[in-house]
Regions:
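Structural motif
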Residues: 47-49
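Conserved glycosyltransferase catalytic-site signature
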Residues: 33, 150-153
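Short His-Asn-centered micro-motif
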Residues: 25-26, 51, 70, 127, ...
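Short pre-catalytic strand/loop immediately N-terminal to key active-site residues, enriched for Gly-Thr
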Residues: 19-25, 142-149
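N-terminal short beta-loop-beta anion/metal-coordinating cradle
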Residues: 1-44, 61
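Mid-sequence, gly/pro-rich, charge-dense loop/helix-turn segments that line enzyme active sites
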Residues: 58-144, 148
Length: 153
């Protein structure tokens, strides 16, 4: 969970405290990656879930207040340019991590290991959330398959 707000909300849900550690990962992609990495090293879990708040891009597929298990995360904002001039790193031929030994390369998109997906579509992770319909349109033009955006994916 990114923040204490999400943890407090979820703590009131049935069976929330029934499964393993429930750690905070922090706010934003960098903090979430660093904190998640340190917690995985400590707890050595078989599975990790990111549970938090995301903004929906399609309320008919993912209603406000709904929950979803998504099969993919796409990173937006790593590349060149902004808005309609933005070009993702992958389109320029760059990986975020080239991979090493048994480790897979990491690009603009990560396919998640999920038992099943509750809806089709991807989660878009951004350093700054959409502030307007225009922001959302720019992102949907580039990533038409996304149904929601967060800042920790």
């Amino acid at each position: 969970m990114p923040t204490e707000i999400e943890r407090q909300h979820l703590a009131s849900q049935p069976r929330f405290n029934s499964y393993g550690p429930r750690e905070l990962c922090g706010f934003g992609p960098v903090a979430a990656a660093a904190r998640t990495s340190s917690q995985i090293a400590i707890h050595k879990p078989d599975r990790v879930l990111l549970i938090g708040i995301a903004g929906t891009f399609n309320a008919s597929v993912l209603p406000v207040g709904g929950a979803a298990l998504l099969p993919r995360v796409i990173m937006h904002g790593i590349g060149v340019g902004t808005d309609e001039t933005f070009v993702p790193a992958g389109e320029m031929g760059f990986q975020h991590w080239r991979g090493e030994g048994e480790e897979s390369a990491i690009g603009d998109e990560i396919v998640l290991s999920t038992p099943r997906s509750s809806i089709s579509g991807s989660l878009l992770t951004c350093s700054a959330a959409s502030a307007s319909t225009q922001d959302m349109r720019h992102r949907l033009d580039r990533y038409p398959e996304v149904v929601a955006e967060d800042m920790e994916g």
